[in-house]
Amino acid sequence: MSDWQEKLQKEFDLAEQARANNNQGQARVCARRAAGIAIREYLARKGIRPSSPSAYDLLNLIKDDPFLSLDLRLIAEHLTLRVTEEFKLPVDVDLVAEARKLCDELLKQISP
């Protein structure tokens, strides 16, 4: 398993652990970081060097990628949403599951 794959799995493990501890905020953070790892690998394999290492910036970058499906761009949009004053998402989505889907789909597109 390569370094980025280990980091990706670690973030998803941490997200599940945070969720088990009823820490939804930390689970969202881990989901975003996992997405950032997959996006960096996706862009690197396409020969694109992102200008920022931030997962949030990378998610914003792919939200407008015309080569990605509308579903994946919507997931990127969800992963960049701000929580309300009650620390809730303004939409009813499972960001960990959505991040997994985004990662899986991006990595399928770059698999040899």
For the regions a language model picked out, list residue spans one by one.
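Short, mixed-charge, low-aromatic patches
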Residues: 13-16, 31-35, 52-61
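Charged alpha-helical initiation segments
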Residues: 1-23
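Generic structural signal for well-ordered, non-membrane alpha-helices
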Residues: 6-13, 33-37, 74-77, 101
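A general secondary-structure boundary signal
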Residues: 11, 27, 83-84
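Short, surface-exposed loop/turn segments at secondary-structure junctions
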Residues: 21-25, 48-49
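Long, charged low-complexity segments
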Residues: 43-44, 48-112
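Short, charged, amphipathic alpha-helical segments
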Residues: 25-32, 93, 97
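Hydrophobic alpha-helical packing segments in soluble, helical-rich domains
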Residues: 27-45
